[in-house]
Amino acid sequence: SCYDLCRPCGPTPLANSCNEPCVRQCQDSRVVIQPSPVVVTLPGPILSSFPQNTAVGSTSAAVGSILSEEGVPISSGGFGLSGFGGRYSGRCLPC
């Protein structure tokens, strides 16, 4: 035999080498990779408000037609709070 033991792992000089194969497994290298912190930004909720118009005391023709369609009699020149009487159910009018 050429050598009883294989040469150490790594580059070796070519001097004093022979042609007999020598297989040696070096110990495994261990590398610890720690993940870097990741910051994730989540968008917050979008809050929007729309003010609602109040129909009390309005003289608009559109409001008048809505009220007359729902069975509340109004005069052509507008209406006051007395026009609701006992028929006002407390429902909100559509904008």
From Swiss-Prot:
Q: Which GO terms describe its cellular component?
A: intermediate filament
Q: Which domain of life is it from?
A: Eukaryota
Query: Mind listing the UniProt keywords for this protein, alphabetically?
Result: Acetylation, Keratin
Q: PANTHER family recorded for this chain?
A: BETA-KERATIN-RELATED PROTEIN-RELATED
**Which residues are reported to carry the modification N-acetylserine?**
1
Under the heading InterPro entries, the entry gives: Keratin
Which organism is this entry from? Answer: Anas platyrhynchos (Mallard)
Question: What Pfam families is this protein classified in?
Answer: Keratin
Can you tell me where the transmembrane regions are?
A: none
The UniProt entry's sequence similarity note says: Belongs to the avian keratin family.
Protein name per Swiss-Prot or TrEMBL = Feather keratin B-4
Q: How does it assemble?
A: The avian keratins (F-ker, S-ker, C-ker and B-ker) are a complex mixture of very similar polypeptides.
A GO term, aspect molecular function:
structural constituent of cytoskeleton
